[in-house]
Amino acid sequence: MTYKEIIKNKEINAYLKKGNENLGQLGYTDHSQKHCMQVAHQAGKILKKLGYSEHEIELAQIAGYMHDIGNVINRSHHAEYGALLANELLKETDMTLEDRVTIVPRFCSYCSCKTGRRNDQRGGCMPGDFICT
C-alpha cells in the first residue's frame, strides 16, 4: 500500500470527510483531506531532510495523511480512535504487518512528542511523531 493509494482510498477519505464535518460543527478549523495532505507532505519533507529511507518517509506520509481519522468518532482521544480505525483499514490492504505496527502506534504518540529528534528507543519518538503536533 502506497501513499498514493491511501489518498485515493474511498473509505479512508469518507472517515476524514465526516470527521472534518463533525469538527466544523464544534467550531474547529479545517481538518480536511487538504490538511491531512499538508501534514503528509511536511512529514515527508522533514524526514527526507533528516536522512530517513524512502520507505520510512512513505510510512510517515501515510500516518500523516491518516492522523485525524479518529475525529469521525470523537475529538477527545481521536488519536487512540484513529489508531484502532487505521489498523482495521490497513489490514484490508496489502500493507505488511511490520509496516502496520510501525504506523499504528504513531497515532497515539504524535500528540505528545514535539522534539523532532530521532529516538528509536521504546517509548521514544519515532520518525514523524513530531510532525502532527
Walk through the language-model features, giving the residues of each:
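Acidic/His-rich, divalent-metal-binding segments that scaffold phosphate/diphosphate chemistry
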Residues: M1-H78, L89-E92
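Divalent metal-dependent catalytic cores for phosphoryl transfer on phosphate-bearing substrates
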Residues: L50-T133
